[in-house]
Amino acid sequence: MTYQETVEYLFNSTPVFEHVGASAYKEGLETTKVLDEHFAHPHTHFLSIHVAGTNGKGSCSHTLAAILQAEGYKVGLYTSPHLVDFRERIKVNGEMISEQEVIDFVEQERNFFEPLHPSFFELTTALAFKHFAEQKVDIAIIEVGLGGRLDCTNIITPILSIITNISLEHTQFLGNTLGAIAAEKAGIIKHRVPVVIGESVPETQIVFKAKAQKEDALIVFAEDIPAVLSSHPNPDGGIAYQTRFFGNIVGELGGSYQEKNANTVLTAVMQLYNKGVIKNAESIAKGFANVCELTGLMGRWQKLQANPLVICDTGHNVGGWTYLSQQIKRQPCKQKRIVFGMVDDKDLHAVMSMLPDDAIYYWTQPSTHRAFPAEKVAETADDYDLHGKVYSTVLEAYQAALQDADEQDFIFVGGSSYVVADLLTSLQKK
């Protein structure tokens, strides 16, 4: 098989949550444990940090990976979803797993795993852990796919667990209250493994504290003693932070929501500092300043061009848009133009209520079966006095926005990681 044929096989022969939604979700770790045993428990050959949460997992995971790389470690990074290439999910020191390794994994192992009927994520997790062990990474940042307690990454025993925040998402699997969702996320809290909680409310704090007490695990709430004292936009891009323990740091990632992520990361760094894993403050500054270069991160308030300024961002739910909407509203420009689409398991009405009413909209739909039809998005937008035209693809919507824009305008592309993925994929092909 070619690489493209291999990726198509993975997507078409295993249930993929990003494509089909609920039918791809599997409760339980039975298949994961069978795969893990077959590959001789690869996750036991490297240290790990486990990252769960509704929003901010990707930014926190990539920033931690960058800091650890700057410290001199060989670092594995497992995240989802990908934007352009499947291999983005599995990286070592910012380098994606090779196409040949993906091909070999499927060709050599399919006779074993096909009778198990694994989900896409179960198979991808097995590939990631196997790759990290073979590459002899020192430490891996492992991002939870969905939930925590029953997520197939939850076979690891990390040196640190992180839960970024909790909001109402994937309620059909995780529960329809913050407390119920927190209980699922708290499933990654392990016996005597410290856990950092990025953001919380009383309803979730109770759950996290109870689980940590049961596991005799140190629990640290990042908001109790904030590691970030203040922040402001850096003139050369990104955000400048004044920190409690590490002086002034410039973070490469833009977007007002990154202050919360930075606070979570720095609180986690303090735990790693106490363990002797991180020893140099210079590594922290270097990691923050070079996240994209060191890890290949895309889609976080990512600048695609200037004049007109074009920004894309993968924020896709109420929690993410709480910050994104304010950032967009504050953006100085002649006219805001927003290319927007969403998928059908998100609260379209809640996000619509946050969108700026002074923008011109280009309603579209990403190329996933889970997408809200662009016509449905436009129809819902009418209820909020938001107006624009409908486009059948993200690229068509983006090209229309570019054609309409003056140099002083601001174009934002987002609403879903799949919208951003479609755009970046199309731009790469041009």
What are these regions (language model features)?
Residues 1-53, 60-62, 66-71:
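Short functional linear segments
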Residues 22-29, 34-37, 41-44, 70-156, ...:
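ATP-dependent carboxylate-amine ligase catalytic core
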Residues 64, 149-159, 424-428:
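Short Gly/Thr/Asp-enriched flexible loops that form oxyanion-binding sites at enzyme active sites
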Residues 78, 194-199, 338-340, 359-367:
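Short internal beta-strands
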Residues 134, 139-144, 152-162, 166-170, ...:
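Nucleotide phosphate-binding/pyrophosphate-handling subdomain across enzymes
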Residues 201-220, 309-312, 318, 351-410:
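C-terminal helical cap/extension that packs against the catalytic core
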